[in-house]
Amino acid sequence: MELIEQVSVAKKANIYFEGKVASRSVFFNDGSKQTLGVVLPGEYEFSTSQGEIMQVTSGSFEVLLPDSTTWQTFSEGSQFELVANASFKIRNSAIAEYCCSYL
């Protein structure tokens, strides 16, 4: 199991899509932040306010990246990058988890 050390974690979860997507914010001593999330099966559309790197930590997602017409599969251990102020879609048929780093 990979650990994140020397951090503060928000007690309250960020809940989206009627509880089907949930994440917790993790704050580092240097001021940076990540979110760790779990996504129940479904299809969801998200928007970014800043650049992000999404790492799949469990399961897999199909992702429709901004300005793309083709869904791409990202499995455990893979990642994709998103620019600020963009929308993207994810879908999954089983529970999946992610770690989001902000650029």
Curated annotation (Swiss-Prot):
Sorted alphabetically, which InterPro entries does this protein's record hold?
Answer: Ppnp, RmlC-like_jellyroll, RmlC_Cupin_sf
What the entry lists under SUPFAM superfamilies is as follows: RmlC-like cupins
Q: What is its EC number?
A: 2.4.2.1, 2.4.2.2
What molecular function terms (GO) are annotated for this protein? guanosine phosphorylase activity; purine-nucleoside phosphorylase activity; thymidine phosphorylase activity; uridine phosphorylase activity
Q: How would you classify this enzyme at the top EC level?
A: transferase
Provide one Gene Ontology cellular component. Answer: cytosol
Q: Name one Pfam family in it.
A: Ppnp
* Highest taxon of the lineage: Bacteria
Disulfide bond as UniProt keyword:
no
UniProt cross-references to HAMAP family, sorted A to Z: Nucleos_phosphorylase_PpnP
Summarize the protein's role.
Catalyzes the phosphorolysis of diverse nucleosides, yielding D-ribose 1-phosphate and the respective free bases. Can use uridine, adenosine, guanosine, cytidine, thymidine, inosine and xanthosine as substrates. Also catalyzes the reverse reactions.
Protein name as catalogued: Pyrimidine/purine nucleoside phosphorylase
This chain is encoded by the gene named: ppnP
